Amino acid sequence: PEALNWGYRNLAQYSGVSLGSVGYIMADLQNSGHLLDADGNWVWKDRNNTIGKWCDYYRDKLLPGIEKRRYSGTIPDNCLEYAMLPGGESAAEQLHLLKSSRLLAYRTGNINLCIAQNRWKEDIDGNIEIRTPFWPECRTFDKIPYLLIYADLLAEDDSRCTEIAGEIFNRFLSGDQ
């Protein structure tokens, strides 16, 4: 929330988008009523609703365009030591919220060694999905943001994932904290 009041240059640098894009996005958030001016500071009108709208957009527009590869294979315990960050169920498993038989990860570098060592085979219906990050290279993470974990779980359209997404929302995202 404090980032709402950063200067546009800082927001552009942090997010990896152009200064013009930051201006457009902030104007859109203000004009659509998502942001309110509270004595010179921007605040969310309904942060939870805005998160929900972003997750819908992610599922319907952004996710279909993300480059992804699917594989079948065994998921080794150390697989995330390779150039990958866990998303969705895999991230929820690291938070000890569920046990998953699938791997969803965003590659952060070359994962060919992982594929070869574990003998993963390309398979459109495989239990392993590796996605190309959709954020700019200048923006590095040591873990996937909770908002993305939440959105990935909701995009699964599975009751178990939806329940876990609710736990993540309540623990890390709810504006009622």
Which residues does each PLM region occupy?
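Long, low-complexity, charge-rich intrinsically disordered regions
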Residues: 58-177
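HTH-adjacent hinge/linker in prokaryotic transcriptional regulators
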Residues: 36-74
